[in-house]
């Protein structure tokens, strides 16, 4: 029988702390010109804290270039997390561009198009 974790929300708390610390590290210490104004949208940590998927959005600049730059700076950012987090291990960071906003805009456009065509039919 599997033992229940005494702190079931620990993974969420660690992910939340990583999100806050990464936001600060990227804004203040990362000097790569390819990384513009980045917003860390969410962090997903594996149960063993070995890997973390970081989803981000970019206000200005090319998302693909920014993703490459962030993945190249993952070691530097992980080192910064070592100094800030009070955990035994710090996960390996994997950055992914969050396409949720683009998908939402596309869906809104499709809905608006369907509503306008339905209004013309009536």
Curated annotation (Swiss-Prot):
It comes from the Bacteria. InterPro entries: KH_dom-like_a/b, RbfA, RbfA_dom_sf. It is found in: Cytoplasm. The gene is rbfA. GO terms for molecular function: ribosomal small subunit binding. GO terms for cellular component: cytosol. The keyword Cytoplasm applies. GO terms for biological process: maturation of SSU-rRNA. Belongs to the RbfA family. PANTHER family: RIBOSOME-BINDING FACTOR A, CHLOROPLASTIC-RELATED. It comes from Polaromonas naphthalenivorans (strain CJ2). Keywords: Cytoplasm, Ribosome biogenesis. This is Ribosome-binding factor A. Monomer. Binds 30S ribosomal subunits, but not 50S ribosomal subunits or 70S ribosomes. Coiled coil: none annotated. One of several proteins that assist in the late maturation steps of the functional core of the 30S ribosomal subunit. Associates with free 30S ribosomal subunits (but not with 30S subunits that are part of 70S ribosomes or polysomes). Required for efficient processing of 16S rRNA. May interact with the 5'-terminal helix region of 16S rRNA.
């Amino acid at each position: 029988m599997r033992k229940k974790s005494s702190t079931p929300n620990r993974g969420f708390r660690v992910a939340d702390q990583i999100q806050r610390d990464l936001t600060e590290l990227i804004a203040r210490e990362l000097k790569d010109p390819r990384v513009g104004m980045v917003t860390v949208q969410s962090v997903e940590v594996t149960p063993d804290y070995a890997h973390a998927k970081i989803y981000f959005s970019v206000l200005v600049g090319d998302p693909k270039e920014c993703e490459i730059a962030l993945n190249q700076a993952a070691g530097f950012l992980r080192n910064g997390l070592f100094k800030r987090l009070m955990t035994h291990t710090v996960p390996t960071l994997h950055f992914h561009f969050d396409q949720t906003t683009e998908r939402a805009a596309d869906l809104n456009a499709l809905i608006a198009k369907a509503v306008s065509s339905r209004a013309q039919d009536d």
